[in-house]
Amino acid sequence: MRRTGGLRLLSAVAAITAVASAAACGGSSARSDDGPTRRGSAAARTTPSPTPTPDPVAALVRRMSTADKVGQLFIPTVQGTTAATGAAMVAKYHPGGVIYFPNNLRTARQTATLSNGLQRAAAKDDGVPLLIGTDEEQGIVSRLPYITRFPTNKALASTKNPDDDVRTAARVTGEELRAVGINQDFAPVADVNVNPRNPVIGVRSFGADPKEVAHLVGVAVDAYRATGIVATVKHFPGHGDTATDSHTGLPVIKHSMATWERLDAPPFQTAIAHHIDMIMTAHIVVPGLDDSGDPATMSKTVLTGLLRDKLGYDGVVVTDSLSMAGATMKYGAPEAAVRAVRAGADMLLMPPRLDSAYRAVLTAVRSGRIPQSRLDQAVTRILRMKQDRGILRSPYVDASRAADIVGSAEHRAAARKVAAHVRAGR
């Protein structure tokens, strides 16, 4: 696979950022102690034109090959507990990110070493640093076996001071993820769980009241972002009223547009107002929003018409796992990946076969089925997010300090306090 024609991507970013800093400081080496300018002089009346500030992300996108841009769209799994196997995959496909599961994770130091190894693989030939993510919602969805544990979102929402407890759980979780080199969390859940028989959301949700869920989503997003973590709310347009698990089937939610606006939309609107980094799509069909029968993940009406145009979101959209039945029942995995990008998704999570999904998207770009402008738009969003969250600048962590942060006395005390609040609130 081609890299970038020999152009040094991250070196270019560093150089352009330095130029931008110089421009912000005046962009001139002229002396500032030459004495005051006389009142009424031409110099006093003339304001020099500001030096345009270069955009390092735009410069980086221009320097990338089409193959490397397509790689940025993917978030595959990695194998093993060391970087050896994952590094080969990163070197071949140059993905935008990877996702960890328990089979990758043994101890805090081991995970930090794994993360650093994968970031070194991504940096070869001046490649782009990785998003390294996981599903650490706490409660019943927790991937790190050694993390400081907190109750479910539903339990946190039940305490007398849910704001404080949600904030504490997100802060501690974010700090521990960052310590082991995980810079992105697929959390918090923004679904309003109004169906008691919901087999997939349930206690992962903050509850059934859209206003309360929206408020606590905002609290969690702020707390995650304060730790430097890329937060991801899920599952748009709302997975809270289903009796079908999208891992094994394709749910149909019979909400009208009016019901969606009242019930499902508020948590996502709040997340957007709180500058959420990423929004994950749902593999669900909502005929009241799009009567095509396509899953929301592959619906331009939902991802572009509702999320982008109606709600005004311009951040990164990531699909839920493309290995799920809800994503593949109608079109198959490679075609699902192409249709998701065409609909407005920027990143593609966990295709069942990375090679075939990658080839399908690359072929679609080269044929024009996915316009180059759509690819560049997605990659620009991804890189800008990485720049804004410091991932382009500083992707590595100090593995020797990971065990001091994860499960620290302060974190364990905070978790015990929250657990006591949950017990007292019931």
Report each predicted region and the residues it spans:
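Preference for extracellular/luminal or secreted protein segments
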Residues: 2-19, 25-93, 329-426
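Second-shell residues forming the walls of enzyme active-site clefts
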Residues: 65, 85, 106-123, 208-374
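Hydrophobic faces of well-ordered beta-strands that scaffold small-molecule active sites
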Residues: 71-78, 96-100, 130-136, 184-188, ...
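A short aromatic-anchored loop/beta-hairpin motif
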Residues: 95-105, 287
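Glycine-rich, aromatic-flanked loop segments that form ligand/cofactor-binding clefts
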Residues: 119-149, 169-191, 213-237
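Flexible hinge/switch segments at interdomain interfaces of large molecular machines
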Residues: 144, 189-195, 236-240, 392-399
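A substrate-binding/cap region within the structured catalytic cores of diverse enzymes
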Residues: 155-182, 189-221, 225, 405-412
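A non-catalytic, amphipathic alpha-helix used as a structural packing/dimerization or gating element
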Residues: 168, 172, 215, 219, ...
